[in-house]
From Swiss-Prot:
GO terms for cellular component: plasma membrane. Its main location: membrane. It comes from the Bacteria. It comes from Rhodopseudomonas palustris (strain BisA53). One of its GO terms (molecular function) is symporter activity. It is a multi-pass membrane protein. Keywords: Cell inner membrane, Cell membrane, Ion transport, Membrane, Potassium, Potassium transport, Symport, Transmembrane, Transmembrane helix, Transport. The chain crosses the membrane at residues 14-34, 56-76, 108-128, 145-165, 176-196, 214-234, 255-275, 293-313, 352-372, 375-395, 402-422, 427-447. The keyword Transmembrane applies. The keyword RNA-binding does not apply. It catalyses: K(+)(in) + H(+)(in) = K(+)(out) + H(+)(out). This is Probable potassium transport system protein Kup 2. Transport of potassium into the cell. Likely operates as a K(+):H(+) symporter. Belongs to the HAK/KUP transporter (TC 2.A.72) family.
C-alpha cells in the first residue's frame, strides 16, 4: 500500500537507536504492515478463478509473496536504496534531486521520471486509506453478519474524521503509533504461529521452485496472480521515503528482525489454515482470529489502518510541499501544526482533494476486494522509476562502471517491470483510477512548468538589467527616503517590477535597497553557513540570495537575521518588503492551447500569497500589482 513516492512522513523525533526503531515501526511499516488483511486472500482468489483452492495454488502464492518481499523490499530498498540518501533524506523527489546533482546538471529525463513517480504517489495515496480502512471494517461481516450493510457508512465516517483531524496535527498522538504497531505486528506473528500448526508442510513454500512451478502451470493466470501478490509489497518503498526521519540502521533493524518475520509468519499461517480448511479462503485473515477476540481484533486492525493512512496523508503533504519548493507546483497554503517540528504541516486544499478522492473510491467500489483491482499500478510505476534513477546514482555518484551498475540494477528493474505488466492487466477492472489521478497530477505539473517558463520569457522582454538602472540612478538620483526596501524577485540580474513601479509612481528611492532572491537547492536542507550570500552593488544597492533546501520551509525574516551577522545593518521595523503581484490575463495569441492557458491562470490565482508563504510580517509588506497577458 503505497507510500510509494512518499516523501518523508513526519514522526516524533527520537534520539536513541531503540526509540528510532520503535518510531520507524509506527510510521514506516504501517502501510506494508496492513497488507495481510487482504493480500493473500486476493492472490488466492485470482489464482483459483472460482475453482477449489489447490495445494499448488497455496504454496505457489506463498512462495511468490515470500520471494517478492525478499527481492523487492529487502534487497532493493532495505539493503540497496537506503544507502542512496540525499543528505540523509530519501524518497522519489530526493532521489531525482540526487541524480541531477550526480549528473552536474538539470536532466530533463530525470525530471520527467521524478514527476511521474510523484504523480503516481498522489494517485495511490487516495487508494491506500480507502482499501486499508475498508479491509479492517469488513471484519464486521464475520463478527456480526447483520452489520455488513454498515461497513461502507462506518468506513466513510472513520475517513472523514481522519481527514478532519489533520488541521490539528499528529504531534500529540504520534507517540502512540509505535506501541500500537508493535502490538499489531506481534499479533500478526502470534496468529501465524498458531495456525502454521494447521498444516506445517506449508513451510515448503520457502523453496522458490513452488513459485516457478505455479507460474509455469498457470499461464496468463499466473501473471494476473502476480498483480495480486504485489499487494503484499506495496508500501515497501516507504522504507526509503522515511529514511530522513529514522536513519538507515533503525529502519533496517526494524524490518529484518521484527516486521519481516511477523509478516511472513502471518502469511504462512493463512496458507496453512487454507490448506486445512479451504472454506477459510473467504476472509483468511479474520478466520484466523478466535471468535471471542474478533471485536478487539477489528478495533486493532482499524487502528493500524488509520495509522497507515495517516502516514500516507502526511507523506502527501510533504511531497506537495517539496514539489512547490522545486517549482513544480504553485505555492499552496501551508499551515504548521507543531511549534517544535517544522515538518509537521497541513495543506488545506490538498487535504480536501485527498478526502474527496478517497470517499469517491469507497462509494464507487464498496469493498476492499473490488479496490484491490485498482491497487498496485501506481506503486509498481514508482518502483520502476526508483530503480532507473537508482542506476544513475550507482553509476555517477558511487562511481561504478556502467556495466557493473547495470548488472546490479537491471534485475531489480526487471522484477519491477513484471509487477508493472501484471498490474496493467487490471487496467479495465479499476487500475485506471490511480493512473487517472496520476495523469491529472502530471498535467498540473506540466502546465505550471510550461506556463512559468512562458511567463519568464514574456516579462523578460520588458525588464531592465539591474546594472543599467543603478548607473542611471547614479546620474539622475531621485528623492531619497530613509529606511531599507527589500524587493523580492526570481531573477536577481534584472530590476524587480516593484522597484520600477516605486520609481515611476512614487518617484522615490530608499537609502538602502536589497534585491532579494530565494533559491531552492538540490539538497533537502542547507547549512546555515550557506543560507545567505550577499553582494554589494554600490552605496544604495545590495543583492542577497537566500538558499533553502527543498524540504525546508522558507522563512525570510529568520534568514535575514543571518545577514546581520555578515555586516548588513538590518532592522525589521524600519524595513519594507516590496512584493510584485501579477494579474494574468489570457492573450489572443498564446503559446499554449486555450485550455492549458486557462488552467495556468487558474493555478496562478490559486497560489498562496508570497507574504504568507515566505513568512514575512504582513505589516511590513507593500504589494505592487501588475497585469500581464499570457
Amino acid at each position: 500500500m503505497a507510500l510509494s513516492s512518499v516523501e518523508p512522513t513526519e514522526a516524533p523525533r527520537a534520539t536513541g537507536f531503540g526509540a528510532l526503531t520503535l518510531g520507524s515501526i509506527g510510521v514506516v511499516f504501517g502501510d506494508i504492515g496492513t497488507s495481510p488483511l487482504y493480500a493473500f486472500r486476493e492472490a488466492v482468489h485470482v489464482a483459483a478463478e472460482g475453482a477449489p483452492v489447490t495445494r499448488v495454488i497455496v504454496l505457489g502464492v506463498l512462495s511468490l509473496i515470500l520471494w517478492s518481499l525478499l527481492i523487492v523490499v529487502t534487497a532493493k530498498y532495505v539493503l540497496l536504496l537506503l544507502r542512496a540518501d540525499n543528505n540523509g533524506e530519501g524518497g522519489t523527489l530526493s532521489l531525482m534531486a540526487l541524480g541531477q546533482r550526480a549528473l552536474g546538471r538539470r536532466s530533463v529525463p530525470l525530471l520527467v521520471l521524478g514527476v511521474i513517480g510523484a504523480s503516481m504517489f498522489i494517485g495511490d495515496s487516495m487508494i491506500t486509506p480507502a482499501i486499508s480502512v475498508l479491509s479492517a471494517v469488513e471484519g464486521l461481516k464475520i463478527a456480526a453478519p447483520a452489520l455488513q450493510h454498515y461497513v461502507v457508512p462506518l468506513t466513510v465516517g472513520i475517513l472523514v474524521a481522519l481527514f478532519a483531524f489533520q488541521r490539528w496535527g499528529t504531534a500529540k498522538v504520534a507517540s502512540a503509533f509505535g506501541p500500537v504497531m508493535v502490538l499489531w505486528f506481534s499479533t500478526l506473528a502470534v496468529l501465524g504461529l498458531l495456525h502454521i500448526n494447521d498444516d506445517p508442510s506449508v513451510i515448503a513454500a520457502i523453496n522458490p521452485w513452488y513459485a516457478v512451478e505455479f507460474m509455469l502451470s498457470h499461464g496468463v493466470i499466473a501473471l494476473v496472480t502476480i498483480g495480486a501478490v504485489f499487494l503484499a509489497v506495496t508500501g515497501g518503498e516507504a522504507l526509503y521515503a522515511d529514511l530522513g526521519h529514522f536513519g538507515r540502521k533503525p529502519i533496517q533493524a526494524g524490518w529484518l528482525f521484527f516486521v519481516l518475520p511477523s509478516l511472513l509468519l502471518n502469511y504462512f499461517g493463512q496458507g496453512a489454515m487454507v490448506l486445512a480448511h479451504p472454506d477459510a479462503v473467504e476472509n483468511t485473515f479474520y478466520r484466523m482470529v478466535p471468535e471471542n477476540l474478533l471485536v478487539p481484533m477489528i478495533l486493532l486492525a482499524t487502528a493500524a489502518t488509520v495509522i497507515a493512512s495517516q502516514a500516507v496523508i502526511t507523506g502527501a503533504f510533504s511531497l506537495i510541499s517539496q514539489a512547490v519548493q522545486l517549482g513544480l507546483l504553485p505555492r499552496f497554503e501551508v499551515r504548521y501544526t507543531s511549534e517544535t517540528h517544522a515538518g509537521q504541516i497541513y495543506l488545506p486544499r490538498v487535504n480536501m482533494l485527498l478526502l474527496a478522492g478517497v470517499l469517491l473510491l469507497v462509494l464507487l467500489f464498496h469493498s476492499s476486494s473490488a479496490l484491490a483491482a485498482a491497487y498496485g499500478i501506481a506503486v509498481s510505476t514508482t518502483m520502476v522509476v526508483d530503480g532507473v534513477m537508482g542506476f544513475v546514482v550507482v553509476w555517477k555518484l558511487w562511481g561504478w562502471r556502467p556495466a557493473a551498475a547495470a548488472a546490479l540494477i537491471i534485475p531489480f528493474v526487471a522484477v519491477d517491470a513484471i509487477f508493472f505488466s501484471a498490474n496493467l492487466l487490471k487496467l479495465m477492472e479499476g487500475a485506471w483510477v490511480p493512473l487517472l489521478f496520476g495523469f491529472l497530477m502530471a498535467m498540473l505539473v506540466w502546465t505550471w512548468r510550461r506556463g512559468s517558463a512562458m511567463l519568464i520569457l514574456k516579462t523578460r522582454r520588458t525588464e531592465v538589467p539591474l546594472p543599467d538602472l543603478i548607473r542611471s540612478l547614479e546620474k539622475r538620483p531621485p528623492h531619497i527616503v530613509r529606511g531599507t526596501a527589500v524587493f523580492l524577485t526570481s531573477d536577481p540580474e534584472y530590476v524587480p517590477s516593484a522597484l520600477l513601479h516605486n520609481l515611476k509612481h512614487n518617484k522615490v528611492l530608499h537609502e538602502h535597497n536589497v534585491i532579494l532572491t530565494i533559491e531552492t537547492a538540490q539538497t533537502p536542507r542547507v547549512d546555515l553557513a550557506d543560507r545567505v550570500r550577499m553582494e554589494s552593488l554600490g552605496d544604495k544597492f545590495a543583492r542577497v540570495r537566500l538558499r533553502f533546501g527543498f524540504m525546508e520551509s522558507p522563512n525570510v525574516p529568520k534568514a535575514l537575521v543571518i545577514a546581520r551577522k555578515l555586516g548588513w545593518q538590518f532592522d525589521i521595523m524600519s524595513t519594507s518588503f516590496f512584493v510584485s503581484r501579477r494579474s494574468l490575463k489570457p492573450a489572443a495569441q498564446s503559446g499554449m492551447p486555450r485550455w492549458q492557458n486557462g488552467l495556468f491562470i487558474a493555478l496562478s490565482r490559486s497560489a498562496n500569497d508570497a507574504t504568507d508563504y515566505f513568512q514575512i510580517p504582513t505589516g511590513r509588506v507593500v504589494e505592487v500589482g501588475t497585469q500581464v497577458t499570457i
